[in-house]
Structures are given as structure tokens and as C-alpha cells.
A protein has these predicted regions:
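Soluble extracellular-acting proteins and domains
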Residues: 1-102
Length: 102
């Protein structure tokens, strides 16, 4: 299952089922220090635009997707976001999508 940031932002009640608090700190979740002041996972998934906002929004959606799919390596995902590597994150999401469609 690959869900969009739009899906996850519209279904905050599902985060609780996954045992994810949408008020959790983005920087703590991904071991990064991108946002000052800190933002929550919910704020991150609601960000608009390219660059770091895209990384944060897509990273949170992929993180939630990775909890749904037990075959996903959450650490690779976290490292991609931590390293601000949007290309690695995009590759991760593409590979994840291919595996889910098999």
C-alpha cells in the first residue's frame, strides 16, 4: 500500500492505529535538525512546495506507509530523510511501489 501525503493528512485517525502520534517532532523522528522552530509530523505532511518541504511531506507519508508494510526498511527511509536526500527517498518510494504491485 502506498498512500499519498493527501491521504495521510485527511486520515489522522489512522495514525493512532499505527501507533504514530502526529504531534511527534519531525526532527526527532528522522534524527535531523531541519526545522527551527521544530514542527510536528502533522505540520510536515501539510507543508506545500518543493525542496525541504517536499522532503518532509513525502518522508512522513513514506514513513507511515513503511509501518503498514512489514517488508519496508524503515531505517533506510529515515536515513534518506535525515541526509536530505530527496533522490534516495524518491528511489525508495519507487521501489516500494514496484514491490507492492507484484
Amino acid at each position: 500500500m502506498e498512500c499519498t501525503p493527501e491521504f495521510w493528512r485527511a486520515n489522522l485517525e489512522l495514525w493512532k492505529i499505527l501507533d504514530v502520534d502526529y504531534n511527534s517532532d519531525f526532527n526527532d523522528t528522522f534524527g535531523s535538525d531541519y526545522f527551527e522552530p521544530n514542527i510536528t509530523l502533522e505540520q510536515a505532511i501539510n507543508l506545500e512546495g518543493p525542496g525541504l518541504n517536499h522532503l518532509a511531506r513525502s518522508g512522513v507519508a513514506a514513513y507511515l506507509d513503511s509501518i503498514v508494510n512489514p517488508y519496508t526498511d524503515v531505517e533506510i527511509l529515515r536515513e534518506s530523510v535525515h541526509d536530505n536526500n530527496i533522490h534516495a527517498l524518491d528511489a525508495f518510494v519507487s521501489l516500494y511501489s514496484e514491490n507492492m504491485n507484484k
